[in-house]
């Protein structure tokens, strides 16, 4: 079995029984189960949700995206070995820690395989919940050009690149393209302020205006739980993105939960603590891959300029990246996952076959 065979690049073609089209994201694919299968699993597996809750199988891939494009490597390598299992393992660890600290639940009900979650359907908040403890990345680039107001928050003068901010900042952006909201352009990933959300809370998916306080509390509390755990590993939690949604509990009450993934190298910046104290930035996140791409291609503006998207897509499609660069990313992801979880990350030789076998034999979901 070759290295390329161990990578799960295509994850939307599994023979899972469903009445709906498979939803394919950049990294995960979602298979919505039939009503009958959802009810059967809730009953037989004892999931703590109402019996009519829609369930889905969420399968992660090893694909790697950056600058809104999917990249590949030499030798037919269509993803990063170990990446999918590492992301899921890290999220699983943080969600468990959140529960131990009395924070909200997540959408995950079951983990049949390192690449697979069984999740409950949620009503998503249409906000990318971003939290920043250090000034770097896009915020630093804007600050260095003279901008001082970010998402309604005014930053002080005299900040330096990569320094710790005086306060933990919440800098939300839109999730998807939202129309008809005053002052908010109908574009994906637009920065918004808390006042934007308060004035249009229902358009952003909040059921009550008071839930804005709850979402901010869950965001900050979750950030602090992860930051403390990473600090114990001499890692710096720089910034991150969370997602939230509503589910209905067994008593018919609506509750806010964490969704998607949390505290991973895909959704966060994580720096090595020793290197940071020495004045250097050693990335333990996807930011290192982004920096590699900017240095690898002769014209980095293609990757940064949204007006050059056709060129960027061609660049990603037509250029196989060096194998060593792909393996560097693999070592970053599996390394930080093993630090966080304290366990080796499983790398199945044929993940797709393993997933099908488990979902057939233990869940009766394969057609």
Curated annotation (Swiss-Prot):
Top-level taxon of the source organism: Bacteria
GO CC term, one of those recorded: cytoplasm
UniProt keyword annotation of Nucleotide-binding present: yes
CDD domains, per the entry: SAICAR_synt_Sc
PROSITE patterns: SAICAR_SYNTHETASE_1
Reaction(s) catalysed by this chain's protein: 5-amino-1-(5-phospho-D-ribosyl)imidazole-4-carboxylate + L-aspartate + ATP = (2S)-2-[5-amino-1-(5-phospho-beta-D-ribosyl)imidazole-4-carboxamido]succinate + ADP + phosphate + 2 H(+)
Pathway in which the depicted protein is active: Purine metabolism; IMP biosynthesis via de novo pathway; 5-amino-1-(5-phospho-D-ribosyl)imidazole-4-carboxamide from 5-amino-1-(5-phospho-D-ribosyl)imidazole-4-carboxylate: step 1/2
Record-level GO BP terms: 'de novo' IMP biosynthetic process
Recorded GO MF terms: ATP binding; phosphoribosylaminoimidazolesuccinocarboxamide synthase activity
Keywords attached to this entry: ATP-binding, Ligase, Nucleotide-binding, Purine biosynthesis
InterPro entries assigned: SAICAR_synt/ADE2_N, SAICAR_synthase_Vibrio-typ, SAICAR_synthetase_CS
Signal sequence coordinates: none
Pfam families, sorted: SAICAR_synt
Its EC number(s): 6.3.2.6
Enzyme class, spelled out: ligase
NCBIfam families attached to this UniProt entry: PRK13960.1, purC_vibrio
Stated family: Belongs to the SAICAR synthetase family.
Official protein name in the record: Phosphoribosylaminoimidazole-succinocarboxamide synthase
Native organism: Shewanella sp. (strain MR-4)
Gene: purC
């Amino acid at each position: 079995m070759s290295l390329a065979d161990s990578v799960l690049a295509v994850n939307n073609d599994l023979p899972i029984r469903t009445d709906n089209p498979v939803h394919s994201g950049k990294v995960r694919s979602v298979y919505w189960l039939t009503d009958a299968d959802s009810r059967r699993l809730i009953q037989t597996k004892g999931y703590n949700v109402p019996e009519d809750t829609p369930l889905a199988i969420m399968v992660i891939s090893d694909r790697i995206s950056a600058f809104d494009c999917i990249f590949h490597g030499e030798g037919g390598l269509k993803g990063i070995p170990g990446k999918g299992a590492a992301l899921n393992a890290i999220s699983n660890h943080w969600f468990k820690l959140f529960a131990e600290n009395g924070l909200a639940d997540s959408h995950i009900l079951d983990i049949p395989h390192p690449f697979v979650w069984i999740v409950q359907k949620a009503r998503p908040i249409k906000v990318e919940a971003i939290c920043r403890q250090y000034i770097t990345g896009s915020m630093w680039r804007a600050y260095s050009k003279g901008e001082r107001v970010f998402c309604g928050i005014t930053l002080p003068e005299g900040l330096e690149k990569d320094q710790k901010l005086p306060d933990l900042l919440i800098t939300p952006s839109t999730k998807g393209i939202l129309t008809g909201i005053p002052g908010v352009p109908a574009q994906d990933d637009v920065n918004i302020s808390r006042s934007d959300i308060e004035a249009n809370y229902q358009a952003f998916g909040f059921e009550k205006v008071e839930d804005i306080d709850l979402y901010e509390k869950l965001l900050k509390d979750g950030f602090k739980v992860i930051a403390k755990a990473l600090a114990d590993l001499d890692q710096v939690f720089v910034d991150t993105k969370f997602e939230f949604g509503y589910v209905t509990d067994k008593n018919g009450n609506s509750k806010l939960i964490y969704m998607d993934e949390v505290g991973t190298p895909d959704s966060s910046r994580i720096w090595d603590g020793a290197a940071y104290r020495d004045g250097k930035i050693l990335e333990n996140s996807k930011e290192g891959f982004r920096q590699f791409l900017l240095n690898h291609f002769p014209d980095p503006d293609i990757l940064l300029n949204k007006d050059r998207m056709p060129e960027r897509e061609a660049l990603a499609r037509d250029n196989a990246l060096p194998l060593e660069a792909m393996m560097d990313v693999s070592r970053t992801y599996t390394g930080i996952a093993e630090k966080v979880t304290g366990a080796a990350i499983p790398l199945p030789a044929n993940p797709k076959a393993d997933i099908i076998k488990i979902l057939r034999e233990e869940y009766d979901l394969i057609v």
